[in-house]
Amino acid sequence: MSTYKVTYSAYAKGSSTVASEGTMTINAESAYMAEQTLKAIFAGLEVIIRYTNNA
């Protein structure tokens, strides 16, 4: 398992209102899984992944 830092913005669906943005550190098997984990955390919001890298 590796540690990834995922930079993201989460918006209310159908809106330009930012609900959350920042960088989250996630332990996962791959960068893709780290991004999917972050999207699951913010289920119900539109999540844009800005950048993902190994921490």
PLM region spans:
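N-terminal compositionally biased, intrinsically disordered segments and leader/signal-like regions
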Residues: 4, 24-26, 53
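Acidic interaction surfaces
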Residues: 14, 18, 31, 54-55
